[in-house]
């Protein structure tokens, strides 16, 4: 009876089921050679399809039989048999070879003998013919799969669509998938819904064109009961004219995943709205843990978000079928490592771990990056970070905890050793225990930990919302270099409304050099802050810096000399400055301070500067004038101070000035007489008080106490 049923089914390439279409793709693409299809066997090697007695597959024809019984429609008479096969248990008992891989490198030009029909599809009748059983490869390998794209596969590989299924313990090797004009594509499966995929290793080539979700292993994986574990991809993946998400393992990941690895080279072009990641193009409302990427991730032209582990992180809400909110869904990446080179010269939002993070619903879940590390080189246009390029969260907080970067990070603006750019409305958010050892290079706005930060304070916020950001216990030893603009050993530039949205930088240390090849504002901890009253708010300090230590050197120009040299005798060539006049005319000019370069509404308390400040303008050294703590050369004016370069004290509200901005109880070992240059400040004001010069020996002891 069973053989008769199979014989009948083999003839049903007819009215319903999945048909092998031979139509050309709707977008222009290279002509793809076709192969023939292997003839399915009449029966499996053994078994009855139950958990205790699974169907056994030992030949390629028996594997093709599995595709046949899943993909074809059944009449009512054979409904029970359909359910048995669709929900059945299957095991491989031998390695399977569809095509000899000896000429694998030429398959895109010359088709091998056989093409493969994926297991599970969407039929031309609109029904889903999904695999819903259990497939256990038992450690065996399926090799030589050829999927030319102009078939009914919908971008499928070994499987097309799986739902409420388990696929485990199987490897795919020397296989080629070409997908054009498909929703999802992957060499193991195009779509996995509410399924468990475990211990699957995939090696081969994937070529995508005009595909939405694409991955080396899976195109889309999601669902309340879904999980990916211990899966990997190696080989190459190229994508062109893609508008969704592309990843080395999974294109769009919306379920818990752990132990994923990518060793393949990923390349994207002509896809300005596509997110690209070494593991996943997007990670949404789930946790990705203990995963790694060693493959190169390259966006040849402008792309969306690009990252070593994932392109885009998104938190949100999980919906029930009736449209009601089921859960508030957070997104977390933890214990993940990238060592691959990340290159996206024409793209914003580029990171060693994640390209970007965002959310789109009020009161939705938090975004967290924890215990992650990057050693790969990261290059982008702007919003570039060793860990994350940009976090722009309008509706929830974020946490970056115990993350380390040792790779060089380079871009034009908003570049950071840990994060390039952050913006948050609802907090509190934190960067805690992070470290950068890699070089950070930008045209402007660069920081050893964070390049550029803003608390957005949108009009719709509740009075109880807080956008506060804390940068705690972070360390930078990497060199920070800008062409001009603003740079800091910890934070480059802060744009901030102040008040309840203040930024707190505490117990952080910088030992890296902070250098500008031209002009700019340089700080050992903070480069500069544009704050409250400048944009219509005057609600207290915008930034608090406490118990921070700088041991890094600040410098300008290529021929830096020690700016702590004594002032020349009267009648010398150098000129003193009219302090107030210069401050008024050069508020956007250069300033260098051991802790802060130049800032509005910033409180600095109990900090230590052990670093030097070196200055030059071309071939003319700039020397310090102790009277004003300002120095001038041929064509530049630089305001300098042991703690604070240019203290932009606001004289509009002297009675409340201390609450908004002050420099107190700080220590320094540098050569300048004054802790700060403060052109608007009257002498002996309490806003600058209790600061002192100490010996290097005292500084060592004090630094240990501050950083405990």
Residue ranges, per PLM feature:
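Sec-dependent signal peptide recognition
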Residues: 2-9
């Amino acid at each position: 009876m069973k053989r008769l049923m199979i014989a009948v089914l083999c003839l049903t390439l007819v009215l319903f089921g999945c048909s092998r279409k031979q139509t050309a793709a709707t977008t222009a693409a290279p002509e793809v050679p076709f192969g023939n299809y292997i003839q399915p066997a009449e029966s499996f090697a053994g078994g009855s399809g139950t958990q205790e007695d699974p169907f056994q597959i030992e030949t390629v024809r028996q594997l093709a039989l599995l595709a046949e019984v899943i993909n074809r429609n059944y009449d009512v008479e054979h409904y029970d048999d359909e359910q048995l096969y669709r929900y059945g248990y299957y095991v491989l008992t031998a390695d399977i070879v569809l095509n000899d891989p000896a000429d694998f490198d030429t398959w895109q030009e010359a088709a091998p003998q056989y093409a493969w029909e994926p297991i599970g599809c969407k039929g031309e009748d609109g029904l889903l013919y999904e695999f819903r059983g259990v497939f256990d490869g038992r450690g065996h390998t399926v090799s030589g799969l050829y999927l030319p794209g102009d078939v009914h596969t919908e971008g499928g590989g070994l499987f097309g669509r799986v739902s409420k299924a388990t696929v485990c313990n199987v490897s795919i090797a020397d296989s080629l998938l070409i997908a054009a004009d498909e929703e999802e594509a992957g060499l193991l499966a195009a779509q996995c819904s509410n399924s468990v995929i475990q211990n699957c290793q995939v090696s081969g080539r994937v070529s995508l064109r005009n595909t939405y979700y694409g991955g080396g292993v899976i195109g889309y994986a999601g669902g309340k009961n879904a999980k990916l574990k211990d899966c990997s991809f190696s080989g190459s993946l190229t994508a062109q004219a893609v508008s969704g998400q592309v990843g080395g393992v999974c294109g769009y990941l919306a379920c818990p995943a752990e132990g994923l690895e990518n060793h393949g080279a990923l390349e994207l072009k002509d896809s300005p709205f596509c997110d690209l990641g070494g593991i996943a193009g997007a990670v949404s409302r789930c946790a990705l843990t203990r995963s790694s990427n060693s493959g190169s991730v390259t966006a040849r032209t402008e792309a969306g978000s690009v990252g070593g582990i994932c392109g885009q992180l998104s938190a949100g809400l999980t919906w029930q079928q009736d449209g009601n909110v089921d859960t508030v869904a957070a997104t977390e990446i933890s214990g993940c490592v990238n060592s691959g080179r990340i290159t996206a010269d024409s793209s914003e939002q580029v990171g060693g771990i994640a390209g970007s993070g965002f959310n789109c619903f009020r009161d939705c879940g938090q975004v967290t990056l924890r215990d992650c590390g990057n050693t790969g080189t990261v290059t982008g246009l702007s919003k570039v970070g060793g860990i994350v390029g940009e976090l722009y969260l309008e509706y929830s907080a974020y946490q970056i905890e115990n993350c380390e970067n040792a790779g060089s990070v380079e871009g034009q603006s908003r570049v950071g050793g840990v994060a390039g750019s952050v913006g948050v409305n609802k907090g509190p958010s934190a960067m805690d225990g992070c470290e950068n050892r890699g070089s950070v290079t930008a045209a402007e706005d660069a920081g050893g930990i964070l390049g550029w930060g803003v608390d957005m304070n949108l009009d719709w916020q509740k009075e109880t919302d807080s956008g506060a950001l804390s940068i705690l216990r972070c360390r930078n030893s990497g060199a920070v270099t800008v062409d001009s603009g603003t740079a800091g050993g910890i934070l480059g530039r802060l744009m901030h409304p102040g008040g309840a949205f203040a930024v707190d930088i505490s117990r952080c240390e910088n030992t890296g050099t902070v250098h500008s090849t031209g002009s700019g504002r340089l700080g050992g901890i903070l480069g500069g802050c544009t704050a409250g009253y400048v944009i219509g708010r005057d609600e207290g300090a915008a930034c608090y810096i406490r118990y921070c230590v700088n041991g890094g050197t600040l410098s300008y120009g290529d021929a830096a000399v020690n700016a702590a040299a004594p002032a020349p005798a009267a009648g010398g060539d150098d000129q003193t400055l009219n302090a107030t006049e210069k401050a008024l005319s050069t508020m956007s000019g250069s300033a260098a301070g051991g802790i802060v370069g130049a800032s509005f509404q910033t409180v600095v308390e109990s900090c230590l500067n052990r670093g030097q400040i070196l200055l030059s303008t071309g071939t003319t050294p700039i020397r310090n004038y102790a009277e004003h703590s300002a120095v001038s050369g041929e064509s530049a004016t630089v305001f300098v101070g042991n703690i604070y370069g240019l203290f932009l004290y606001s004289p509009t509200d002297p009675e409340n000035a201390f609450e908004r901005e002050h420099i107190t109880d700080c220590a320094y070992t540098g050569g300048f007489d004054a802790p700060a240059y403060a052109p608007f400040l009257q002498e002996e004001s309490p806003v600058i008080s209790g600061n002192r010069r100490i010996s290097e020996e005292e500084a060592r002891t004090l630094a240990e106490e501050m950083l405990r």
